[in-house]
Amino acid sequence: MTNDRFGLRWGLAGGTTLASIDEARASARFAEAAGFDSFWISHATGVDPIVTLACLGSDFPGISEVGTSVVPLYGRHPVGLAQLARTAQNAVGGRLTLGVGTASKRHVEGALGLSWDKPFSYAREFIEALE
């Protein structure tokens, strides 16, 4: 017996973004029918991945894990992100994995107008606040 697990990631690295919750639902339905163990949504310019996964709720019992890959920390507050993740975790029956990261200097400074000073320290402090 093997412990291999396979997931489907949809979003930025997949070459597209999810434009709607219905599109995410169709993608998750495909993942479940194809036998994938997990379903992941990237944070990009489409729908919010955490809200979308919460909306999918328990529609797909054959998928053992749903997750974000990756939610950028800059531009969010730890309390708000923790509350959002906790709500989604409840909606999906404890199957959520929250993937987070700093994004890129170009995005943080250019799109958000924030300082890219010490991004790893920023991420560490943010994650500690989430806990």
What are these regions (language model features)?
Residues 4-19, 75-131:
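Flexible, glycine-rich active-site loops centered on histidine and acidic residues
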Residues 69-73:
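Conserved strand-turn element in the central/C-terminal portion of the radical SAM core barrel
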Residues 1-68:
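N-terminal beta1-alpha1-beta2 module of alpha/beta enzyme domains
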